[in-house]
């Protein structure tokens, strides 16, 4: 009897398990949406983004609006070329060590390429060597470096551009007078070349024009204004000023305005644009300024970087991005308007 009861209980248990299994199997169809959790299709854009080459761009900083224009050119070209562009720079153009630290930080990210505008043409050499050792192509832009590591340098011919400024000054002064020269620095390639281009041209072609300077204001408005005021105090007969970048010439304009000088007795020539210079040219306070192509510089450095990433090994030593002269008669011309920034 006991055996019969056990047999019956066992049969009931088997039946119950079978029933449970059947009941559990029923909702399987309702779990079909789980299959939609497979992330293959939705993750496709992530894979595309990960495949984009990462280009590090270390600029000279954001002290002047010039660099915002360069950044725009670089970022827009990066989008066009299918690259991720990280455009950075120190707070001022005197921050050499912070810029070197930024280089080291970008090196650790293992970028596909580096674009670099040096604040000090010599100081970056050891760090750039590390990029070369890691087989990361380097493109110099705006300010070159004293090194063979960069595959090319994308820049204005600053010697020729500053010589043009000297010619405009010499012609306006009738070949005689005294001109104060204020440059942003004597360590970057742009500072060195602009000072050389202006002074050499003036000395060669206009020997009766005396040069006061160059003196260096770090591209800072206040410092450059103080230098201009000191030059004027020590040289009552100064009748011209050349400022080698946006901040340098901006300081000159501030000094002349603050001292309430007779603007008709001064010829002021600058470099680059920005709203202050545009207004000064339109008002007649400033004769004119040499215009670089900042958007073109930014775009072209990304173009060259992408060529290197794709395996190109032969490059022109310099990619000349050109320059224009802007004065009251030409500032509204289409070609000049295309390179102005505010």
Residue ranges and their predicted role:
Residues 1-9:
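Bacterial N-terminal signal peptides that target proteins for export
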Residues 16-19:
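C-terminal motif of bacterial Sec signal peptides marking the signal peptidase cleavage site
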Residues 6, 21-342:
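A residue-level marker of the well-folded mature domains of exported/periplasmic proteins
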Residues 11-13:
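Hydrophobic helical h-region of N-terminal Sec-dependent signal peptides
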